[in-house]
């Protein structure tokens, strides 16, 4: 078929990096082996760096190295060797095959046990509280486990204030309301 198929495991444990270059496709599990093969890759990719420095994560395909991308968890790409281009990209999410009903008490027990295990040690634990469901649950359970939850939120300087959307800090506002209602150290 004259194709190369690259896939990454659904959990995203093992990395797969790739780059389209003039000669074809370069790929590997480590970026350092690709740097000499990908022109300009020793320069920083500003989008990836910006994403990481503002949010603490990089959910993009872009890596810090210009021109080198990563496959996302569960992603597969098909590269056409003759035409030197990616012809297909798909992402598969594994769904648990279970007919088990949601048990709120069991969920709470598992969540609390996970928080308890993660908070063992002498270091102080803090939660980045966005005001959303996930961080709210973690902060709430952390308070139940330790007696107090240290939370923090960031407020952003908007580049543009939309007349209807406001200043884009509604998440920070929600987090503050939640922190006050639960007496978090915010």
How should each PLM-predicted stretch be described?
Residues 1-186:
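Cysteine-centered catalytic environments shared across enzyme families
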């Amino acid at each position: 078929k004259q194709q190369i198929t690259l896939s990454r495991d659904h959990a995203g444990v093992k990395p797969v990096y790739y780059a389209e270059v003039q000669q074809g496709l370069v790929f590997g599990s480590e970026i350092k082996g690709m740097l000499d093969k990908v022109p300009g890759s020793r320069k920083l990719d500003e989008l990836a760096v910006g994403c990481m420095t503002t949010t603490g994560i990089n959910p993009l395909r872009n890596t810090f190295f210009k021109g080198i991308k990563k496959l996302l968890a569960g992603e597969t790409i098909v590269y056409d060797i003759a035409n030197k281009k990616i012809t297909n990209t798909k992402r598969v999410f594994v769904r648990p095959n279970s007919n088990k009903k949601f048990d709120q008490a069991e969920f709470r027990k598992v969540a609390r046990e996970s928080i308890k295990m993660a908070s063992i040690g002498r270091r102080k634990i803090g939660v980045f509280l966005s005001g959303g469901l996930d961080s709210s649950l973690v902060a709430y359970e952390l308070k139940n486990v330790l007696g107090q939850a240290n939370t923090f939120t960031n407020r952003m300087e908007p580049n543009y204030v939309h007349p209807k959307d406001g200043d884009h800090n509604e998440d920070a506002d929600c987090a503050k309301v939640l922190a006050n209602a639960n007496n978090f150290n915010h």
